[in-house]
Amino acid sequence: MYKQYFRLREEPFNITPDPRFLYLTAQHREALNHLLYGIRQRKGFICLTGEVGTGKTTLSRALLRELGETFHTALILNPVLTDTQLLRAIVTEFGVETKRRDRLGYLSLLNEFLLKVNSAGQDAVLIIDEAQTMTVDSLEQVRLLSNLETERQKLLQICLLGQPELRRKLAKPELRQLAQRITVRCHLDNMDAQDTEAYLRHRLSVAAESPDTPSVHFDPGAIREIYRFSGGTPRLINAIGDKALLAGYVYQTGQIDDRLARIAAAELEEACPSA
């Protein structure tokens, strides 16, 4: 609705995890570098945690882009599956055509695929999002996948993404073997006020028809209100930013001030009281 008015090619605050819109704060850049290091050095297990909306999924998309074509990747977005369903999902994500099999059949297929990848001098990476939703048994199943190896190296690098509950779950005695195998751990916090401002400007620049001459501007008062309401959580910044642009369109102004930001925040709070 407001794209044409503000001369935007696309909506700047869409909540889909598009790496083009990824703004790397210092902590996001550090986390990405740690993930890349762990995978490229074949460290086996990697764990990234953060509160809801801090950018874990978007960071995983950036990770996939950074890895390049020499890495075969499988991304599991909904890991609430049985052991057999999880193995089938992993095999399918790696692009291996398969008919319905039992657990051992999928495991054999996965092992064959990983050996072929390894013999070609390439690597395979499994990324599991929302890993905190997995049962202890499912996490143990994932641990067993790390036993797929040659005499020299692991065949599969595994990256677990999840909310802070994942860390608490991994601390359980029955998962101590898995916890001991995690060699790289990262945690994402919410952004501070300065990063919130830079984040807003970055997304507007990416979406603008003319990035050097933006037709809409969030003034310092608006940025303070957005930070106060969102607490620096990217997902909430996106939600209030989108509604603030809509308010600017309604009031026919390209200057988003604290009043419009408060209007946007109030609308969001009314629609989603838990926001």
Residue ranges and their predicted role:
Residues 47-52, 58, 105-109, 133-141, ...:
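Sensor-1/coupling segment of RecA-like P-loop NTPase cores
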Residues 177, 205-275:
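C-terminal alpha-helical "lid" subdomain
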Residues 1-42, 275:
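A short, basic N-terminal segment
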Residues 11-13, 70-72, 81-100:
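Conserved NTP-binding/hydrolysis module of P-loop NTPases
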Residues 76-80, 170-173, 183-196:
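Conserved AAA+ ATPase "SRH/arginine-finger" region at the nucleotide-binding site
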Residues 82, 98-141, 150-154, 191-196, ...:
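Mid-core helix/loop region of P-loop NTP-binding domains shared across ATPases and GTPases
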